Structures are given as C-alpha cells and as structure tokens.
Amino acid sequence: MKYFTTVLILATSLLHGTGAWMMSGRTHPELNWHTIETDHFDVHYHEGIRDIAVQGASIAEQVRPILMEQMGLDTLRRLDIVFTTEDEVLNGFAMPSNHTVIWVDQNDAALWAGDEKWMRTVLAHELQHLVFFNTIKGPWWAPEPMNTIYAGVPGWVVEGLAEYYTEKWRPFRFDISHKGHVIGNTVHKIQDPHNDGFSKSLYLADRFGDSTIVKILSDRNNAKLLDFKKSFKKHTGIKLKQFNEDWRRHMNTFFFGQRAQKERVEDVGRVHKLPLKRMAAFDYFNDSLRVAMVGQLSRGQGDLSLVVATRDTAKENKEWKKRVEKAEKKGEKPKKVKPKWKIKEFDHGVFGELIQNLDVAPDGQSIIYPKYRFGQNQSLQFGIWKLGIESKKKTLLTPNMRANYPQYSPDGSKIVFVAHE
C-alpha cells in the first residue's frame, strides 16, 4: 500500500506538468520564458507576449477577491499563471497543483466569448477552478488525488461553477447545444461537463441559492474530508440523483416551451436532405448538382472528411421511367425518386475550430477551406487551403498565418479570411 501511494502521488505530480504537451504533443524548447510577480500571482510568459501577460496579471488581481468571496474563502495561497501563444488552441486548463495554462491570440475567441474579451473570460474561468480546488481540499494527510477521489465531486460541478461564477449563458456556451440535446431527447446523456454543468449550476443556484453551494463544498465529515453526495443531501434535502432528474425535466420544459412559440421549419419552406447524415458544413456549386461538405462518412470516424457529392441524374431518370411504366399499368401515380448521389472524398482532418467551414469558387473549379496543421516550430494552427476539383491538388495559401473562415469574392478573383501572424 505504501508503494502504491508513493507511485500514485509521483504519477499525479508528473501529469500536472504535461497538460500543454498533451494538447499538441510538442514541448517548444525554442521558447524563452519570463515571469512577472504581482501581489498574489506569478505570471509566466514567453518572449513576444509581454503586453498580454501584463494585461492578464492585472485581470487576475482584479478578479481574485471576487472569486474568493463567491466561494467563502478568507485566504488563498499564491498561484501560478502561464500564458502561451505558440499553439492555436481555444482553451485553457487549471490543475490542483495551483497553476493554470492559457492559450492566447485565438481567432475564434469572438464567436465563443460573445461580447466579452477572451482573456477576461478564460482567465477568470481557470482561476475559479484554482479557487474551487482550494475550497474542497482536505487535510494535509490526504493530498491530491486521494482527496478528490474521496470527495467524489461530479465533473459538472467543477466546470459548471466556473461558468456560473465567471460567464454568461450564450449561444456557444451552451444554448445551441442544449436545444439540440432537447430535440434529440439526449439531455440526460450529455457527456461534456462544461455543457450540462453550466445549466445545472444555474438551476442549482436558482433553486437553492448561492449560499447553499458554499455550504455543500465547505462541509466536512469527522475525518475532515468532503463527501459531496452526503453534503449535497444534507444541505438541499434531496439526493443528487433526484436533482439530476429534476434538472432534466426543467430543461425539457423550458426549451420545448420556447420551441412551441416558434414556427416549424416546414412552414418556412421545403426541407431538403443532404447526402451526409453526419454533416458539419456544406456549400452548393452553382449548378446545384454538386455540393461540397465537411462531415463523417461513417459512425465513429475520428476526424472529418471533405467530400464532394454529385447527383447521378442519369440513374434518377432511369428509375423514374421504370416507376412511370409500372404506375401506368396499375393506374396509379408514380412515386417520387429520391436524389442519388456519388460521394468522393478529397481530404480529411479538422476543418475549423468552433465552426467547420468551406467555400466553393463561383466557377466551381476549386474549394477553399481551413485545416488544422503543424506550422513553424511544430506549432498547431489553422491554415487556408485551396483544392482544385479536377487536379485534386491542394495548395496552402497561408504558410505564415493562423487563418480561418475563407470566402471567395463574388467574381472569384479574391479571397477574404480572418487571420493573425
């Protein structure tokens, strides 16, 4: 047991230092790092982003007392913040080792954050995690991860509270997703703790109050350890399982009530089905007989495929003639023939971060699209690619930029896109 405990603590400590590497598989030894010391933080950054680090340090000092008050903390140890722009990753993470790593300079930040700045939103979110870890920590003899394992705090609580205390409910966080899960009757199967965590935390606070959240997380048993399920039952009067069911009913009632006030899609116009069932983006060619799509060709596909589907009108006409002949013999009306498509894959990978996207040239000879790749110094980034339909040749148009959302001009002579160097 002593050997197992030692190995567990050592392994956990090593994992705490590999978060950024696990995202990209690269360590970036070419970077030179510096540190800014504030009253309560050590802010680490590499060359080229000092202004961003200074801004982040200021934000951190401003949000710290608010986060502590929200969680009922009187004291908080010194924390470490790491800023990097080396990879195009719209994310950040925090660890129980009291440090957070945040990727800055992100193209999709405006879509994700709405009317707030990426730095304020993501930094406040990750610092709330660190405050949370310090709120639920156990006695000295139960270090991480033993304390966390025993506490049994659900992932939705960890992520949901960070969103509840530092963010606003918005389309990408997670109104659009909730609507999809409600329509598909999969609200109870949401796997991302960020997703259901936000709405569950909003529901928890609305039903029981912010003070109850603090009481749940501050409660300790005789061994000075947090038992989340027992604490939840003690301070809310209901079991966690019942809370989850109440939340599910509440979400369904809210979103179906919202949907009942809107017109049906069929009332707006005729609905057409695309050739791919698992489709993320599409654009028709001008002749409307072809459509370019980004999606999955089969269930369980790990990446996405860029395909062009072409209608086989010859087969459709042939089948239509057969149906007409049969219908005439029986004196019936012939049934419509469903569109028949030939699908051809041209590329595969990731074609956008928040939104997969592509654009077909006005002359139908090429397609432009973003694709995730390794750039200079093996940095992860999106670049704009041009695909020739006939030649099948793929050309990288932005070798020195992080670029996304390409669109042809009406005459096809120019391309506009979002980018930074």
Mark where each language-model region is:
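Sec-dependent N-terminal signal peptides
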Residues: F4-S13
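Juxtacatalytic substrate-recognition/specificity segment
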Residues: W21-T148, P154, D227, G352
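Active-site-proximal alpha-helical
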Residues: L67, V153-D175, K179-I238
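A flexible loop/linker signature enriched in serine peptidases of the S9 family
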Residues: D175, V294-V308, D312-K330, H348-I355, ...
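Blade/loop signatures of beta-propeller domains
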Residues: R248-D267, E328-V337
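A short beta-strand motif characteristic of beta-propeller blades
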Residues: D267-L274, K342-G349, K392-T398
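Beta-strand-rich domains and repeat architectures in extracellular enzymes and scaffolds
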Residues: R270-V307
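Blade-terminus and WD-like Trp-Asp/Gly-His loop motifs, strongest in beta-propeller folds
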Residues: F282-R290, L358-S366, P406-K414
